Amino acid sequence: MFRGIYETTIDAKGRTSLPARFRDVLVESFGDERFFVTNSVPVDLGGGVYSSGLLIFPYQEWFIFEESFLNGKGLTSAQRNSIMRTIVAPAVECSADKLGRVLVPPHLRKNAVLEREILFVGAMKKVEIWSQSEWDKVRAHDMKAFPSDSEAVAELGL
């Protein structure tokens, strides 16, 4: 599982380094160094403002998601189209080079507003990528919502 938050940078050409621990997890837990990068589900910050990062899916986990999406019962046509345009269509297969460097394509960098300072955030079977500025907004939103989530957290044993 992916855990932890790692701060790093991305250059103007979209090159960044996938944390070594996450590269190890890809191979040790998921059996493949390849992965897919795509847009994350936008976070509603209220007042018509949304924030978005990116998601890294381990290679096989992406195909599990695709199968689930294709067989998804209960999705309306509008929901299916929105998911297709937002998450499925922009997905790109990637792998890190021997030094751990990854190239994030321009269309994904633009959507996630990736600037110089970025974060890789472990999210169990996925990894989130956020610009520092967008992460700060989402975390502030999460902290406001957290008290109302305390019952759900307690049910998880925390």
UniProtKB/Swiss-Prot annotation:
GO BP term, pick one: negative regulation of DNA-templated transcription initiation
Keywords from the UniProt entry: Cytoplasm, DNA-binding, Repeat, Transcription, Transcription regulation
PROSITE patterns, per database record: SPOVT_ABRB (PS51740)
Keyword Thylakoid carried by entry: no
Highest taxon in the source lineage: Bacteria
Compartments where located: Cytoplasm, Nucleoid
UniProt GO MF annotations: DNA-binding transcription factor activity; transcription cis-regulatory region binding
Family label: Belongs to the MraZ family.
Protein name in the entry: Transcriptional regulator MraZ
Record organism: Geobacter metallireducens (strain ATCC 53774 / DSM 7210 / GS-15)
Gene: mraZ
